[in-house]
Amino acid sequence: MPIDFTLNDNQRRLRREARQFAKDVLSGVPVATRDLPSPIERFVATRPFYERLVAEGFLRKCIPVSVGGDCAGLVDLAILAEEFYTVDANVSLTMLSTVLGLAPLVVGGKPEQHQRFLPPFLAAKGAPLAAFASTEPGGSANVGSLPPGEGVRTTARRFGDSWVISGRKQWISAATGWNGQGADLLTVVCRTDANVEPSRGISIIAVPRPDSGLIFEHAFDMLGHRAHLTPRFRLDAVQVPAGNLLGQEGGGLQLAAESFAGSGALVGIFGVALMRAAFQFALSFAKSEKRGGIQQIIQHQAVGYALADAKTTIEAARVLSWHACRALDTAAPGALELAIHAKVFGSEAAVRVITNLMQVVGVDSYGHELPLAGLLQDAVALPLFAGGNIGVRRRQLHALMLDPAYDDLATLDGVCLAETAFSNGE
């Protein structure tokens, strides 16, 4: 794989269009949501922005060309995600969570399933939502745990030509939809055979919004991403056709691994976006503010060095994430390991860099009149979601290194160990 991150004409156009849309449209999200008291109200208030995003074709730009969308690869998705997330993390996360919700369908679905479930997401109208329903109350870092560990507790039982699904899920982005009755499509991780080990007993099933049985329980009032919804809900004997099984029965852990692989690299980009927004503000502040002195504070070496360190980290995190995206796009050796590194590095760097930039600005950065406090609140989530860095991501890296066949140069020219990395995690 050539080491070349030069953007082609289409990618430069995508970046330009996404940046303009974020500036013109997504910049209005904070004003529309900040004074609303509940997470549900704030989330619902983002719907017009999301509808505009869909209407202008940006959701299509996140869905692979191979299934009818306009996305040529994860690098393109990373470019789009950075431009959106830099301006507003809320609607951006709703869009990208929908993409994750579709991932098991895109990766493991049959052509007939693509034709049944994807049209609403390709139509460039409305406000379609999808959600990957994996996490459960009590945590899901050990979804593949052997007894006596509980692992996945949501069950799907086969009755004739149907699956009947029961269980509880939480922290699933936009899973209960705009009105509490469900997203347009859920891809549900569930136990289809309790009598075999998880690697053969967990599956993923597509669940269109049911007429009954999806019961909203709670909306988390989060520290950051204040206008994004991550509810807890229950599936109470929800019945779907047997043909909604995605991939092979019992192949859910591997399908989840393949679906989640790209999310790691993209969370790294989320970190880049938040750092970029913080850096741009802090740089402008340092060039314009004297803070009672006789010269702009950027003239002070401590301030200049702090800004330089921040920019170095941003560039490093972006290149690592792009490298992971390109490796995943081309199924290059070591792609999964790169994606995990991108997630861990980018997410943790965001918290550290934004905190350091707040020190450049001073105590005023602690108030919400300036953007840095809100950016830090958003950044704190990144090491925790899409596979927590401690409970899941570092454990995946640990599993790679424990394998006798592990090659530390696999990210250059070694053997891809994706199956091993996910054998005991998401």
Predicted features by range, described:
Residues 1-93, 120, 404-406, 410-426:
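Amphipathic, small/basic residue-rich leader segments at the start of a protein or domain
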Residues 80, 361-426:
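Glycine-rich phosphate/cofactor-binding loops in nucleotide/flavin-utilizing enzymes
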Residues 3-10, 14, 215-315, 425:
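Glycine-rich beta->alpha junctions and the first turn(s) of the following alpha-helix
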Residues 30-40, 287-295, 311-345, 354-366:
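C-terminal helix-coil-helix/basic helical segment that borders enzyme active sites and/or dimer interfaces
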Residues 170-177, 262-267, 381-389:
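Glycine-rich phosphate/pyrophosphate-binding beta-alpha loops
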Residues 92-114, 140-141:
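N-terminal glycine-rich flavin-associated loop
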Residues 168-214:
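A short core secondary-structure module
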Residues 126-140, 189:
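A short, Trp-centered hydrophobic/proline-enriched beta-strand micro-motif
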